[in-house]
Amino acid sequence: GNVFESGSRTPVAITILVKKKGAKHDGFIHYCDIGDYLSRQQKLQIISDERSVEAIKWRRIIPSLNGDWLNQRNPNFTNFAALGSKRRDKCDSFFAENYAIGQCTNRDVWIYSFEPEAKNAIRMIEFYNKELVRCQEEWKNHLTTNHIGTGEKAKEAFYTNLRSNKSNCISWSRGLFRCFCREIQIDCNAEYRTVMRRPFCKVNCYYKREIIEYPSKWESIFPRNDYTNVVICISGTGSNKGFSAIITDCIQDYQLLFNAQCFPLYIYEKAESKESAQLSFDNMTVGESKTWTRRFAVTDVILSKFRGIYGDKVNKEDIFYYVYAVLQSPRYSESYKEDLVKDMPRIPLLAHFPEYVRIGRALAELHLNYEKPVNAEELGIMVEMRRADYTVVDKMRFGKGKDKSTIEYNPYITIRNIPEEAYNYIVNGKSAIEWIVEQYAVTTDKSSDIVNDPNAYAGGKYIFDLLISIISVSLKTQELIAQLPEYKEI
């Protein structure tokens, strides 16, 4: 029944197998794609119009060398250097091993918050520690009365059955339970970090490795809050939301973009001595930075390759921003659409290198400073102010029907005349404006009853100014992308 339901998103194929007796060759596959998200009536109409399989306009498909039957990859893609590679013997990629996946907490609602205080994370840690003491005592009692089942596996099973699973007190995961079975107490001394959880939506993070399921390599990208860096984030393989890239100056969440992979400008490493660290920081004098060295993440192999083509003045920072410009190029993402879904991005060598670097830097500066306030009148936007109250009540809403030129910010403020083209800047399947409207809403987690209020992040006009700013960023991003020079692979 669901095959013909309106707008069904489940991929369905009707297969007709024809057996020909005495055939002297292998079989063929003929294919016809009728389109996506059709209504029930449209699907039935197509079948009715064709009447017979003989009337269908079939396309014979032959697998590529990559084994692709449909959505075949571009064979030119493999001629380019990959952005990164975890294989130590593959040193010809742009970043080699110097990249990370986005941070994955497995308990976002407990660790991430718009509020500056991490009261929920601390409350969970305190509950964890109390549970550990209680279970340890029960285990000791068990050992005194039982002579079998006293090993580590028995203890793990015992703790599994005994621990509290109250969803409003704790969020268990495999990693946290492993700490529990090892009887590791967790202290509440942690640093607060900024994380971009979704496009253009920052949250406060209680940065404690024991309660972050997959912290990845972020300590080598941002060792502490006073260490600066910028990081290009790209969609991981398998995305059905289209390929995207975004840049931040903070930690990135695993779902900032789909299964995010993150490529920093710098990599930090612990120094052998304070003297060597100071020399390696190009005379940086920030706080405790003397205990770390900083180097560019782009490899020497790639630098040598680019200098051989574009000249000796090219540096690793130029290459970093060149990469960001290429990843924003519509021609690149369209030419290698299927490759970007299935493989790590590979970056071509293009003509007009200096222009790509210039626009890559401009795009990065725009996206890194997306919170900078903008005058709504300069964008031709009308703001109807019935009361100067900038609190988001529940959530923002678009106009009636499909009208996105209007946003009801709250009961007292309405924003009108939002340019239609502002919605054409798409990040991870949605416009940047839609991400703001969706993410900056008051939410209550059903399992934990934790309330997350975006008004607590910066207060005042922050969310209002952010919304206006993102409209401007969306328009300027498209202007800069339109300035990209001719896409010509060398």
Model-derived features: where do they sit?
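Sequence-level detector for compositionally biased, low-complexity segments
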Residues: 1-490
